[in-house]
Amino acid sequence: MELVVKSVSPETLKTATLVVTVGESRVLAGAARTVDILSGGAVSLILKRGDLAGKVGQSLLLHNLPNIKAERVLLVGTGKEDELSDRQLKKIVGAALTCLKGLGGTDAAIALDDLSVKNRDTYGMARLLVEALADGEYVFDRFKTQKAEVRALKKITLLTDKVKAADVERASTHAQAIATGMALTRDLGNLPPNICHPTYLGEEAKALGKAHKNLKVEVHDEKKLADLGMGSFLAVAQGSAQPPRLIVMNYQGGKKGDQPFVLVGKGITFDTGGISIKPASGMDEMKFDMCGAASVFGTLRAVLELKLPINLVCILACAENMPSGTATRPGDIVTTMSGQTVEILNTDAEGRLVLCDALTYAERFKPQAVIDIATLTGACVVALGGHTSGLLGNNDALINQLLDAGKQADDRAWQLPLFDEYQEQLDSPFADIANIGGPKGGTITAACFLSRFTKAYHWAHLDIAGTAWLSGGKEKGATGRPVPLLTQYLLDRAGV
């Protein structure tokens, strides 16, 4: 879908559909008022008849209004308030898209200047709107033999005045890059585990590297992992016929010698739980256990689209967790790359076992900051539900930067404590550390485990177990989060 920014009067634009807004007060303003005046009061007359109450997300389609170049005018309700919430704006965009997709036209124009969102300037509002448009266009039907017949919109024009045009252009550019990254993340997450395994992700990384000269890609196999001393990582993979892969993608967009930012993604392409096997119900959704790695892929894709002037290293720890005669047993003790030993009390707490070695590996890049992203704990879903990612770390400035980025991107996170008292729950009588800390504070103790391997740099941990995918029904699938949060964080660091 092409997005174009124009500064013209709405009534003069030739388009299949012009989208304007009407509130519950039904007092017309902006583009709606202009259309009403030029059409001889056609809009006012319809509102007086009660055909549109103006509630958020309501819509009414008008055809062939006099003196209006658009073939149709779509009225969309914006509710009672002068300023919308982020959620209301997304609902309005969704309602407009639903209507537009059912029409014969392939283009539309949206009057942006009539929309106002709480605590957002022109850039923030326009970016949220464009991201919502892109989200509404996403379809994953690769394995459907009969594709859904949906009329695709080929072009949307964003109408704004000349003073705001530069901000809207910038917002549109950023939003489209983020949407591209989210779509890649969703595609990878939605792929079945018989296709999307560690080797597949390695090939995807190599393909991305070939397409971009400033992206160096290395894919390390199990022999290299053994040479590196990644005993914890290898322990997770040893029960599967699928070999593990450590994928390292090094983007050089900044100056040579600039310290990079490092993103580390959990890439468990299917998680049965291993010997500590999960219940059968819902196990199909464990293909989403690689969404941390998928979100790193997506964020990198957005960074490449935007050509951000930063250095970024992306490390993906990819494995499959399966039960077999060669699988890790509860009670096994392994030696991590750091030299610390781990007693594996539960093989279903495997994400931290691959991440700890990847986090140790990250030290060699002398990073400005390291952020790991993982569908790590069910406890995070219990604590925060499906709307907010869990955030923990060892540096307050980094935590605050990520919280702010999440707020800006409408991809929120919430900080949980990382107090020393929780560390005691990981004590083991036989090894340096146990891989679980009991039933209480599971998200926190998982982060405490990771913190043992991140003392050399500023580090944050995003637990996306509740936000990376939706369960059940037609909406089931990967969400693309937290690509908006991570991209916003990197945009802020790049200063663009």
Swiss-Prot record:
It comes from Pseudomonas syringae pv. syringae (strain B728a). InterPro entries: Leucine_aapep/pepB, Macro_dom-like, Peptidase_M17_C, Peptidase_M17_leu_NH2_pept, Peptidase_M17_N. Mn(2+) 1 binds at residues 271, 348, 350. This is Probable cytosol aminopeptidase. Mn(2+) 2 binds at residues 266, 271, 289, 350. Its EC number is 3.4.11.1, 3.4.11.10. The keyword Lipid biosynthesis does not apply. One of its GO terms (molecular function) is manganese ion binding. Binds 2 manganese ions per subunit.
